[in-house]
From Swiss-Prot:
Protein name (Swiss-Prot/TrEMBL): Cytochrome P450 71A25
Similarity comment text for this entry: Belongs to the cytochrome P450 family.
Encoding gene per record: CYP71A25
Entry's EC annotation: 1.14.-.-
InterPro entries xrefs: Cyt_P450, Cyt_P450_CS, Cyt_P450_E_grp-I, Cyt_P450_sf
Keywords: Heme, Iron, Membrane, Metal-binding, Monooxygenase, Oxidoreductase, Transmembrane, Transmembrane helix
Keyword Transcription: no
Cofactor(s) needed by this chain: heme
Residues the entry annotates as binding heme: C431
Cross-referenced CDD domains: CYP71-like
Length: 490
């Protein structure tokens, strides 16, 4: 009985604090907010597919919407013009990243590039990535790796002998092997411990800490084993990357060409005023692997899904690729430049299916006025790239349809200058690996449609294959894509 009384008074007290916080301390007009519940605010409205739930809410409350996730104010952005105002007009004010228990435990206490706080360390690490890891010269240097792995993929598909096969698994294997060779120097694919490790990491990145939003419920994270999972995952990741770095140091790899070799060279050179630490090498390598592998796999899986659902688009793409590469056994990266419809297909797949529909959160470092709204320092900001890509005001009444043709007569691109297409972000925090991802995605997709005629298995033809999504930070198909590929005789 006494416990019930204590619990009741605790709830009443926390409710009073919640209402007091909501009604006081406002310096100006705030963006519209859906009604929340005491203590948890709007947490209950996120849903399994957060990007879809927030898109529905934004249609009612507007493209700039303020949620209260427990005690944390989060600004949700669902339109291109508001994204531009934040990522261009007020880019510096929103360039910070919020710290979280998850990023601290899994990303080396935010020593990577993606989650590092905005400041001198982040600027130095981004400079290392842009100059030494992801420059056009470095991207070109890995051409042989891409070509070799694509050749292996094509041979694997031919072995299916025109029977239904798991396209998703083949694409995941390809992107994993390419990124492993580029970043780590060799493959770590198949059913290895590393594969299990990365699968666990992907699952954890799609979760969140209840205690981070509602501190007095932090014990729930401990009870459900979330804290223990983070600790074990962080240790397992560090054990793996420490061994990889040590193997590189022990070998005679001063002329090595993978990304860890490049980072170790930077460490040895000890530039004046800057020295890269060992923990930073591991953190940046983890960034490259997680971002590069997951992004490319997700895009290719959805691109093939949409092409199989839209045979006319598939036929048009095949006609373009086979015309340009007439008489060739495969598509090379030199052939890609003139393939306008291929590039349109990639853009349309990214528009409808951005690999990370809710972009990594930003955080304001100062008070900002957005339109007529006051945004206090410390407010988190999340861009709903999925909603922006389906905005009717930008894309028209057919915004939900897969139509690559919409990109043929427009200069809209995904490299951060056009805010209606934001799969890689924009501004200071844009993904620095855009060029690497684009080259891989284009040449893989071109070879798939050049080398094979594709169709859905008979059992999938009625619904033209489903487009159900998985849940998590990156959004794949919920179920693997199966298809039939028949070798095309050139």
């Amino acid at each position: 009985m006494m416990m019930m009384i204590i619990l009741l008074w605790s709830i009443i007290f926390m409710t009073i604090l919640f209402l007091k916080k909501q009604l006081s301390g406002k310096k100006g007009k705030t963006p519209p907010s859906p009604p929340g519940l005491p203590l948890i605010g709007n947490l209950h409205q996120l849903g399994r597919h957060t990007h879809r739930s927030l898109c529905d809410l934004s249609r009612r409350y507007g493209p700039l919407m303020l949620l209260h996730l427990g005690r944390v104010p989060v600004l949700i952005v669902s339109s291109a013009d508001m994204a531009q105002e934040i990522l261009k007009t007020h880019d510096q004010a929103f360039a910070n990243r919020p710290r979280s228990k998850l990023s601290q435990k899994l990303l080396y206490n935010n020593r990577d590039v993606a989650s590092a706080p905005y400041g001198e360390y982040w600027r130095q690490m981004k400079s290392v990535c842009v100059i030494h890891l992801l420059s056009n010269k470095m991207v070109r240097s890995f051409r042989d790796v891409r070509e070799e792995e694509i050749t292996l993929m094509m041979a694997k598909i031919r072995k299916s002998s025109s029977l239904p096969f798991n396209v998703s698994k083949v694409l995941e294997c390809l992107t994993n092997d390419v990124i492993c060779r580029v970043a780590l120097g060799r493959k770590y694919g198949g059913e290895t411990d590393f594969k299990k490790l990365t699968d666990r990491l992907s699952e954890l990145l799609g979760t969140f800490s209840i205690g981070s939003f509602v501190p007095w419920l932090a014990w729930v994270d401990w009870i459900r084993g979330w804290d223990a999972q983070l600790d074990k995952m962080g240790k397992d990741l560090d054990d793996f990357f420490e061994k990889v770095v040590q193997d590189h140091e022990d070998g005679d790899r001063r002329d090595g060409t993978d990304l860890i070799d490049a980072l170790l060279r930077v460490k040895r050179e000890k530039s004046p005023g800057f020295e890269i630490e060992r923990v930073s090498i591991k953190a940046i390598t983890l960034d490259v692997f997680v971002g590069g592998s997951d992004t490319s796999f997700t895009l290719l899986e959805w691109a093939m899904t949409e092409l199989l659902r839209h045979p006319k688009s598939l036929n048009r793409l095949q006609e373009e690729v086979r015309t340009i590469c007439k008489g060739k056994s495969r598509v090379s990266e030199d052939d890609i430049q003139g393939m306008k419809y291929l590039k349109a297909v990639i853009k349309e797949a990214l528009r409808l299916h951005p690999p990370f529909p809710m972009m990594a959160p930003h955080e304001s470092t100062e008070d900002v006025k957005l339109r007529d709204y006051h945004i206090p320092a410390g407010t988190q900001v999340m861009m709903n790239a999925w909603a922006i890509g389906r905005e009717v005001a930008t894309w028209g009444p057919d915004a939900e349809e897969f139509k690559p043709e919409r990109h043929l007569d427009t200069s809209v691109d995904f490299r951060g200058q056009n805010f209606e297409l934001l799969p890689f972000g924009a501004g200071r925090r844009i993904c620095p690996a855009v060029s690497f991802a684009v080259v891989l995605n284009e040449v893989v997709l071109a070879n798939l449609v050049h080398g094979f005629d594709w169709k859905l298995p008979e059992e999938s033809k009625e619904d033209k294959t489903d487009v159900a999504e998985s849940s998590g930070f990156s959004v794949h198909r919920e179920f693997p894509l199966y298809a039939v590929a028949s070798p095309y005789l050139t």
